[in-house]
Amino acid sequence: MGVDGIDKADYKKVVEHCYLCDLCYMTKCPYVPPHEWNVDFPHLMLRAKAVRFKQSGARFRDRVLTNTDQVGRLASLPVVVNAVNAANRSAPLRGVLEKTLKIHANAKLPPYHNPTLRQQLRNHESSTTDAIEITDRTQGKVALFATCYGNYNAPDLALDLVQVFEHNHIPMTLVRTEQCCGMPKFELGDLDAVARASEHNRDSLIEMIDAGWDIVAPVPSCVLMFKQELPLMFPNNADLQRIRKRIFDPFEYLYLRHRAGLLNVEFKHPLGTVAYHAACHQRVQNFGSRTKQILELVPETKLVTIERCSGHDGTYAVKLETHNASMKIVRPIVKRIQAVAPDHYGSDCPIAATQLWNGLGGDTPPRHPISLLRIAYGL
C-alpha cells in the first residue's frame, strides 16, 4: 500500500511517533541515495514537525521538557535540587505530575545535581603536564562541551571523561560558555530556537578551536547536532563546517589516539561481561564501533553489542501518550541483557541507558562506557 492508501488524518500520528533516531535512513530504507527517489524520511518528518510548530506551537509540557537549560538551572539550585529529586522519587507526586503535565508516572526522570559540572570544574587545571602530541586528526588537547545533561543531570559521567582523557595525557578544559545543543527543540520542530542556540554555541566553540583545542561532548545526540544537523540547516556557515570537523565522540577521539599509538593500554581491572547498547545517534555518525574496540582492549572483558533503538528519545519515553510504546520498543534489548546476565550494562547515550534500567527494573543502574574505562584504569 502506498501513501495514497493512508488516511490523511493519520499523517500526524506518523509524525508524532517519529523521534528522529535516523536508523530508518541508515539501516532500513532502500530508497535513500543513490536511489533516484532520494528519500530522507527523518528530515521529511522534521519538516512536518517544523510546520506543525509554526502553525500550532507546542503544549506547555513539551515546552518545559525541551527547555533543558532553564529547567536545569532552576532544579539544580541549593535546596530546590533536593525537593525536585525527592518529588521525582515520590509515587504520589508523580501521580499528580501525570495528571497535570501528562508525564508518565513510571518514566524514570534524571536526577539533578548541586554543584553542577561547570561549578565543579570552574577552576579546573589539567592534571597532565606532558608535552602535547598532535596527530593527523587530533590536536591532543580537548575542550569539553559539557551538554545540559552532563552539566545538570550526570556530572559524574563528565568527570569520569576528564579523568580518562587526562590519564591519557590529554589536557582538558571546559568550553567557556555553552547552551543546550538544540536537539530537544530540533525534535520539537522549533527551528528558530535551534538557530538561536547555534549562534551562541558557534562563537564559543570557534573560540576554542581557534586556540587549538578539539571539542568533545559526552552525549551522542549533541555531537550529532554539530556534526550533521546544524551543518545541514546552515550549509553556507563556514564556522559550523569547521566545528563539524573538530567535534568528536569520546570513544572516537580515544580511538584516533590509539591508532597513533598514544592510548594508555595499561589496564588494572577486568570488566567481565558487558552488555553494550550502541546508541542510535552515535551509530549514524558512521565512525565505526569505537566504544566496543576500545573496551575490548581491557583484558578479560567480553562485550555483547546490542544494536537496537531504546525508544527513549529524551521525551518520547516520558510523555504519557507514548511511554507505553517506548517500553515496547526497549523490550527486546531488555530481554537480551537478561539473557546475557552481564557484570555491567550500559550505553553511550545516558538517556538510553536510563530506558534500559527502567525496562530491567531492579536496583542495578547502568554504567556508561567511559565510566567502565575509568574503572578498568583503576582511577
Labelled PLM ranges:
Residues 39-379:
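Iron-sulfur cluster-binding electron-transfer modules in prokaryotic oxidoreductases
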Residues 27, 35-38:
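Short, non-ligating residues that shape and space the ligands of small metal-coordination modules
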Residues 11-17, 22, 174, 273, ...:
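Residue-level signal for mature regions of secreted extracellular proteins and peptides
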